[in-house]
Amino acid sequence: MSDEHYLDNEEKSVVIVMSSGPSTPHRCATPFYISAILASMDAEVSIFLTMEGVKLGQTGVAENLTAMQGGKTIIEFMRDAKSAGVRLYLCKPAMPGYQLSESDIIEEVDEIANAGKMADLILACDKSLFF
């Protein structure tokens, strides 16, 4: 086992690329849960919603979606992550395929961005996760 402890390391950055969406609700809570934990451990965390993941940024979707019956809504997980300092990006090129316009997007999204931004985030981060 390593002698290093997470608090002994310099600041870390993590990018979570999330392509899961409403068709796979059981995959939608964990990325936000993990990101909140990482951010509370002083990591700089970004989540990039792409492909079907952009649907989670649509008003009314995450508010009415749970990963498991009787569980917290996905928007609650998203808000927990935001409260911990996680930045949330939404893929602009994916929006037309899901008939989304900027006026449809929830306030929790920090930035509507292109794939170049996602590539920059991935290349600059210490760790990347894909859901």
Which residues are covered by each model-predicted region?
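A glycine-rich helix N-cap at a beta->alpha junction
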Residues: 64-92
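Short, glycine-rich nucleotide/cofactor-binding loops
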Residues: 14-29, 62, 68
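Anion (oxyanion) recognition and catalysis
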Residues: 39, 82, 122-123
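Short internal beta-strands
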Residues: 44-50, 88-92
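C-terminal binding/interaction regions
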Residues: 108, 112, 116-125
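Positively charged, low-complexity intrinsically disordered leader regions
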Residues: 1-9
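N-terminal beta-loop-helix "entrance" segment that forms/cooperates
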Residues: 53-67
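Histidine-anchored nucleotide/phosphate-binding helix
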Residues: 28-43, 47
